[in-house]
A protein has these predicted regions:
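Active-site-proximal or metal-binding-adjacent scaffold patches in catalytic folds
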Residues: 1-198, 207-248
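Walker B catalytic acidic pair
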Residues: 203
């Protein structure tokens, strides 16, 4: 029996340490117990190499309470979506309003601030707003994909949306005459248009180049110029995009 006794925890269990959420995780490829901050989920992950050592991971997390508190304090606040809020969608300021009927995007005839109108309150309202944002994301990202694919002389790929935690887009090259497949994070709609467009160009370049070699980056630069500012923006603000739609 280990120093920490029989396993008292399960993979995926959650603890609270220093007021912060800590998730226990088994990773059989890990060599030791460790802690890391997951900024996209707003939590700390305590990893153990086996189920038997999860208790050790939990004890390690409790022993590092001060570190956990300091790191979690650096995270952007969780941002709910409520009537009266103003958010940016592809860099445009958008107002959120409560209204009866189907959730929808409204472009005022006078050219003023667009509005997302949705029913409900609390999480129900937020879910309805996110559906509208996803529809905008699908439309804009598909348009930009068609634009960049045409510039590259590549066939228009199949487009999908998801909510991945570790990447903003992914590309599977087409084989044997079949179209490629590109999936984007819907949260790109919450980034400036130029940043989202860079991600589209990046994934479209993968329709021709599977790696990140010089030819790949030359394709990207031809479409959107220097990618460095856009990559830096995502590193600096990516965690904030994942905080949207999460109650504070």
């Amino acid at each position: 029996m280990s120093l920490f006794g029989r396993a008292q925890h399960a993979d995926g269990d959650r603890l609270t340490v220093a007021g912060a959420p800590v998730r226990l995780k088994v990773n059989t490829r890990a060599r030791r117990v460790s802690l890391r901050l997951d900024p996209t989920r707003g939590e700390v992950v305590a990893t153990a190499p086996s189920l038997r050592r999860l208790a050790e991971a939990a004890a390690f997390a409790n022993a590092r309470a001060a570190w956990i508190a300091s790191r979690v304090a650096e995270l952007p606040p969780r941002q709910g979506l409520a009537p009266g809020d103003r958010i940016e969608v592809f860099g445009r300021l958008v107002r959120l309003e409560a209204a009866d009927g189907r959730a929808r995007w409204v472009e005022p005839a006078d050219g003023s601030t667009p509005v997302i109108r949705a029913m409900g309150d609390g999480e129900g309202f937020a879910r309805a707003v996110i559906l509208v944002i996803k529809a905008q994301a699908r439309r804009v990202l598909a348009e930009r994909t068609a634009h960049h694919a045409a510039r590259l002389g590549a066939a228009m790929p199949t487009i999908g949306l998801g909510d991945p935690r570790a990447r903003w887009g992914s590309c599977r090259m087409g084989r044997g005459g079949a179209a490629g497949v590109i999936r984007y994070s819907w949260r790109l709609a919450l980034a400036p248009f130029e940043v989202a467009d860079y991600v589209v160009a990046h994934e479209c370049a993968h329709l021709l180049e599977a790696n990140h070699g010089p030819r790949f980056w030359s394709h990207v630069a031809a479409m959107v110029g220097d990618p460095a500012p856009h990559r830096a923006w995502l590193r600096a603000h990516g965690a904030r995009l994942h905080a949207f739609g999460q109650p504070g």
